[in-house]
Curated annotation (Swiss-Prot):
UniProt gene name: mnmG
GO molecular function: flavin adenine dinucleotide binding
One example of a Gene Ontology biological process annotation: tRNA wobble uridine modification
Essential cofactor(s): FAD
Listed name of the protein: tRNA uridine 5-carboxymethylaminomethyl modification enzyme MnmG
């Protein structure tokens, strides 16, 4: 295709879509000095949260920390608009600790719009983008602009598609449907056909969202309350972004036998179980129908009632998405304890939409077919605001580097959850919505949320996304952390000190003469907060500094071993695999990996790692198994008696 009309305007970068991926991409490109435009179907719904009004959770919070460490904005806005915060997996190790924040969805959107409006080099335009303009240079197509529904043409050196669920979007309530990207908003027309004309493969995916209920119609006093427990925790590493607002409670109810029977009796009325659509939905966020069918042995499922904001009565019924008809939805809601008189403000619905399988992308998120065309977010087959925001930042960075004639930034999977996600997306044939999980990373002890700044802020500063003020804060934190670690390694607690008996009682271990505070921290159950409580640490030392020093000391051996493992996997990619290797007998491999490896019989570890269905965790397990076999075959050195 080529221009048939002169461009109305021209930009360096055009971002198509104003969701979480689009906002990060546009702000990133603009901050890199590029003349950028963000096109949205509805500028009043910028960075909307159409499903769960929350940010973070397992692995997702690590992504948010990483985006912030690079200079992105999702963490800052989540901190500014949080109405409840909790630490998940607090009883487990730091590799899986996760901050989760309920956010005020309308305030979040308003603050993002204000941020976009006040970002230099960034223009906002409301329009439906229906076409892509390209030129041909040699055998390579190159993006040259976009076309809108009403015929305007805009020139650009790079275009980033972040269309979410809007391409060919169709929402379903029972067997009734309408064209829409989400409730109340029209679907985008033409862009799917344009991508197909350019040679791209597209497919369909499905997601859904539960009903919203009027808080005033719920007997909250009859339900279990879930208050905030992490008001002093934040996603951003920048203290200037920390906001401690009024916190609100969530509440918990459960499904009943009546709920389950209603669902079983009416499964045929859903679009999926009725055979009307067959798009794949998210495995890790199933509808209530899927839960009842897949977990038929369970008598009850937990349901969370989450406020959508401080100034709205709307309650999000988390864990209760459904594709059933609206009248049955109300019956289902009223079968839940505490919701017998529930008033449903908005029905649940499913949405199926076109997406672009990400194997058609480079790790930079540039498409392989069209130079200068990038894709990010739910359009790539992911699910979640956090996954979208991370991809948006990567696409924004690499669009800028392409225009500047620089090499793209590659995020290796061992360096971040961002890298893990992108590596999975571009190398695996994923046919269901992709959600980041801690289990997807074989390096999760190193890829923690608390050290995301140490892993990525130097890169953010090098790219120009971390300003001098943030860089100075980062250096000050590192200096304070090193100072605290040195203090802990040198200061000793003597058995004669007044606090020693209390410390011995808490840890269940005697102090023999004296012990360094670092060795004290290494004892199970002893934490930096306990040192503060006993007067053995400075209470004024920032929490991130105290906890960072503690984790480095307490888990130093594990961290060193995992880093060695990372280095070993890199070295071992050319390692030969025995032709007669019995993969079925390696219990640490996933079932899918055993099947694929047995069928293909790869000759090297590197070849095995590139087989779809064989995860990086499987490769690590295979490597460890090979090392164990080698040690068992290696003869022991003769003893003195044998000699």
């Amino acid at each position: 295709m080529s221009f048939s009309a002169a461009p109305t305007e021209s930009f360096d970068v055009i971002v198509v879509g104003g969701g979480h991926a689009g906002c990060e991409a546009a702000i990133t490109a603009a901050r890199l000095g590029l003349n950028t435009a963000l096109f949205s179907l509805n500028l009043d719904r910028i960075a909307w949260q159409p499903c769960n009004p929350a940010v973070g959770g397992p692995a997702k919070s690590q992504l948010v920390h990483e985006v912030d460490a690079l200079g992105g904005v999702i963490g800052r806005l989540a901190d500014a608009t949080a109405i409840q915060k909790r630490i998940l997996n607090a009883s487990r190790g730091p590799a899986v600790w996760a901050l989760r924040a309920q956010t005020d969805k309308r305030l979040y959107s308003r603050q993002m719009l204000q941020l976009l409006q006040h970002t230099p080099n960034l223009a906002l335009r409301e329009a439906m983008v229906t076409g892509l303009e390209t030129t041909v240079a040699g055998d390579q197509q190159r993006i040259s602009g976009i076309r809108t529904y009403f015929g305007s043409v805009y020139g650009a050196d790079a275009v980033i598609l972040t269309a979410g669920t809007f391409l060919g979007g169709r929402i379903w309530v029972g067997h009734q449907s309408m064209a829409a990207g989400r409730a109340g908003e029209q679907a985008a027309e033409g862009l799917t056909e344009t991508l197909q004309e350019l040679g791209f493969q597209t497919d369909r995916l499905k997601t859904g969202t539960p009903a919203r209920v009027d808080r005033r119609s719920i007997a909250l006093d009859q339900l279990e309350e879930q208050p905030s427990d992490a008001a002093d925790r934040f996603f951003s590493f920048d203290p200037a972004a920390w906001v401690s607002g009024e916190q609100m409670s969530c509440h918990i109810t459960r499904t009943t036998a009546e709920t389950h029977q209603l669902i079983r009796d009416n499964l045929h009325l859903t679009a999926i179980y009725g055979g009307v659509i067959d798009s794949k939905g998210p495995r890790y966020c199933p509808s209530i129908e899927d839960k009842i069918v897949r977990f038929a042995d369970k008598d009850s499922h937990q349901i969370f009632l989450e406020p959508e904001g401080r100034d709205t009565p709307e309650i999000y019924v988390q864990g209760f998405s459904t594709g059933l008809p609206e009248p049955i939805q109300l019956q289902l809601l009223r079968s839940l304890p505490g919701l017998e008189q529930a008033v449903m403000l908005r029905p649940a619905y499913s949405v199926d939409y076109d997406y672009l399988p990400a194997t058609q992308l480079k790790p930079s998120l540039e498409t392989k077919r069209v130079r200068g065309l990038f894709s990010a977010g739910q359009l790539n087959g992911t699910t979640g605001y956090e996954e979208a925001a991370a991809q948006g930042l990567v696409a924004g960075v690499n669009a800028g580097r392409l225009i500047g004639g620089q090499e793209p930034v590659h995020f290796p999977r061992e360096g971040s959850y961002i890298g893990t996600m992108i590596d999975d997306l571009v190398s695996k044939d994923l046919r269901e919505p992709y959600r980041v999980l801690t289990s997807r990373s074989e390096y999760r002890l190193i890829l923690r949320g608390d050290n995301a700044d140490r892993r990525l802020t130097p890169l953010g500063h090098e790219l120009g996304l971390i300003d001098d003020r943030r860089w100075q804060l980062f250096e000050d934190k590192l200096q304070a952390m090193e100072g605290e670690k040195q203090r802990l390694e040198t200061v000793r607690l003597k058995v004669s000190d007044p606090v020693a008996p209390a410390v011995e009682q808490e840890t269940g271990a005697a102090i023999k003469g004296s012990i360094t505070l670092a060795d004290l921290l290494r004892r199970p159950g002893m934490h930096a907060a306990d040192l503060v409580r006993h007067g053995l640490a400075d209470a004024d030392l920032p929490l991130p500094v105290r906890e960072g020093a503690e984790i480095d000391i307490k888990y130093s051996g594990y961290l060193q071993r995992q880093q060695q493992q990372i280095d070993q996997v890199k070295r071992q990619s050319q390692r030969k695999l025995p032709a007669d290797l019995n993969y079925a007998g390696i219990g640490t491999l996933s079932n899918e990996a055993r099947e694929k490896l047995t069928a293909i019989q790869p000759s090297t570890l590197g070849q095995a790692s590139r087989i779809p269905g064989v995860s990086k965790a499987d490769i690590t397990a295979l490597l460890m198994w090979l090392e164990l076999q080698q040690r068992e075959r290696q003869p022991l050195a003769p003893t003195a008696e044998a000699r």
